[in-house]
Amino acid sequence: MDPQTAPSRALLLLLFLHLAFLGGRSHPLGSPGSASDLETSGLQEQRNHLQGKLSELQVEQTSLEPLQESPRPTGVWKSREVATEGIRGHRKMVLYTLRAPRSPKMVQGSGCFGRKMDRISSSSGLGCKVLRRH
């Protein structure tokens, strides 16, 4: 044995024997039986708690079901649908008018497809067929 590696090998051997004596566990107080008992008892408590909550929710749901099944007049639903359609149509028109100035429009008959703003605030039509008088 090399004198430099002998202490490290001895330390590893002692550590191995210590862990082998404990059954591979790092803590001497823990045992396989007690750890599994604690885990199963904790899981069992959680399971019982969740089952209790589930049964409470089911009781609440069954008590609320008769209230939800009450028939409503179809006229009320139709008037609501018409009102929402009117609101949606109005909203579409507002959005269309708001977006309209942003999009370039073609001027009919002139062939224009947009406008150009110069740095000095003068504007000109792009692609416009304009007859100029001399």
Curated annotation (Swiss-Prot):
It comes from the Eukaryota. GO terms for cellular component: cytoplasm; extracellular region; extracellular space; protein-containing complex. Residues 1-26 form the signal peptide. Pfam families: ANP (PF00212). InterPro entries: Natr_peptide, Natr_peptide_CS, Natriuretic_peptide, Natriuretic_peptide_brain. The keyword Secreted applies. This is Natriuretic peptides B. It comes from Homo sapiens (Human). The lineage of its organism: Eukaryota, Metazoa, Chordata, Craniata, Vertebrata. The gene is NPPB.
